C-alpha cells in the first residue's frame, strides 16, 4: 500500500496539475480533498491542453477512480459545466466519485463574496469571487448545504428557505442590495444535482477500501501551503487547509495512511492576488520571467506576480506539511538570465529571520537575503536526464535541495508531459 499527497509549496500555480497527472500514471485512485473551482490546473494529455477546476487530473485515465472529497466546496453549475466540457472532448467521467458530504456553493455565496470584498476597500484579500470563503463560513456556522441535501428535493427546499432568510436579511439591511429569490435558485440547482447524482457516494468508504486493498492512492492538493487558512500569509489566504493535514479531514482517511508528501514548486516564485511577497520582482527580470513562463492565472487570467526562489517559504511548507519529496518545475524559464538569486533568509529591522513570520505587517517589511548563482544560456527543453543539465543548472537545483532540506523527485524543463523527468518511483520508496 502506498499513498501520496501532492501539495503546492508556494502560493499556488506551481504546476501541481502536471505533476499529479504525471504521478497518476501509476496511481489507481486520484482524489481532491479541499478547495473548489477557485483552483485551476492545466493538463496536457495526448497533445491536447485541458483546463480543469474541480475534477481531479486522473479523470483522463478510465481505469483510475477519481474522487471529489468531502472537504471540497462544489459549485453544482461549475461541476455540470466541467463534466460537459470533458464529454464534448470525448473524455469519459464514469470513473468519477463525488462525496455526499461535500458542501455546495450557491449564488448567494458568490454575491456575498463580492459584497464583502468591495466593502473591505484597500484591505481586500484578492479573492477570486467564486464564493469559496462564504461557503466555508456557512459550513463552520452549520448552515451549509451539502450534496446529500441537494439530492433530496424536500430537504434542499427546506434548507434553502432557511438560509435565504438569513442571507437576504444581510443583503438588504447591511449591503442595501436586492434579495435573492428562492425560485431563482431552487429548480435550477436541484436539476444540476440530478445531473451528477449517479457519481455521488460516501467517498471515505471508497478511499479507505482502496487503501485497505493496497491500491496506490494519490491525493491532489489545490492552491499552496502559503495559502493555507492556518499556515499561509493570513489573511491573504484561501478558506481551507491546503497543507497535507487537510487530507485527513477533507478525504476522510486517518493520518497513518499517508506515506509520502510531495511538494511542488517552481524554480522561481509566483503569486496571484494581494499579500506580502518578499522576493517580488517589479523590474525587467520580473517581466521577462512572467512572459517566458506565461504567468497568468488559469481561473482569473490575471497576471501573476513573480519573484526569485524563496527557500524560507519552501522550508516553512516542508515543516508544516511534512514534505518528503520535491518536484521542481519551470527550470527552463530561467534560461538566459546571467545571474540567479535564491532567498536564504530575511532581514527585519536589523534582525535575522530564518523562519517565515506569521505577521503580514512584518513580512511586508522583510528584506530578502540573497545568494547569487551563475545562470546558463543553453537550451534545456530537450533534457531528459539530470546529468544532462548544464553544470550551472545542476548547481542551482542542488542548492535548492540543500536550502529546503527536501530531496528532488522530479524536475521539469517545459510544460509537456515528456519534459518532466522523474528520478525515482515514489510508490516503491
Curated annotation (Swiss-Prot):
It is an enzyme of class 6 (ligase). SUPFAM superfamilies: P-loop containing nucleoside triphosphate hydrolases (SSF52540). Keywords: Cytoplasm, GTP-binding, Ligase, Magnesium, Metal-binding, Nucleotide-binding, Purine biosynthesis. InterPro entries: Adenylosuccin_syn_GTP-bd, Adenylosuccin_syn_Lys_AS, Adenylosuccinate_synth_dom1, Adenylosuccinate_synth_dom2, Adenylosuccinate_synth_dom3, Adenylosuccinate_synthetase, P-loop_NTPase. GO terms for cellular component: cytoplasm. GTP binds at residues 12-18, 40-42, 304, 330-332, 412-414. Mg(2+) binds at residues 13, 40. Its cofactor is Mg(2+). Binds 1 Mg(2+) ion per subunit. The active site is at residues 13, 41. Its EC number is 6.3.4.4. It catalyses: IMP + L-aspartate + GTP = N(6)-(1,2-dicarboxyethyl)-AMP + GDP + phosphate + 2 H(+). PROSITE patterns: ADENYLOSUCCIN_SYN_1 (PS01266), ADENYLOSUCCIN_SYN_2 (PS00513). One of its GO terms (biological process) is IMP metabolic process. Its main location: cytoplasm. IMP binds at residues 13-16, 38-41, 128, 142, 223, 238, 302. Pathway: Purine metabolism; AMP biosynthesis via de novo pathway; AMP from IMP: step 1/2. It holds the Pfam family Adenylsucc_synt. Substrate binds at residues 298-304. One of its GO terms (molecular function) is GTP binding. CDD domains: AdSS. SMART domains: Adenylsucc_synt. Belongs to the adenylosuccinate synthetase family. HAMAP family: Adenylosucc_synth (MF_00011). Homodimer. This is Adenylosuccinate synthetase.
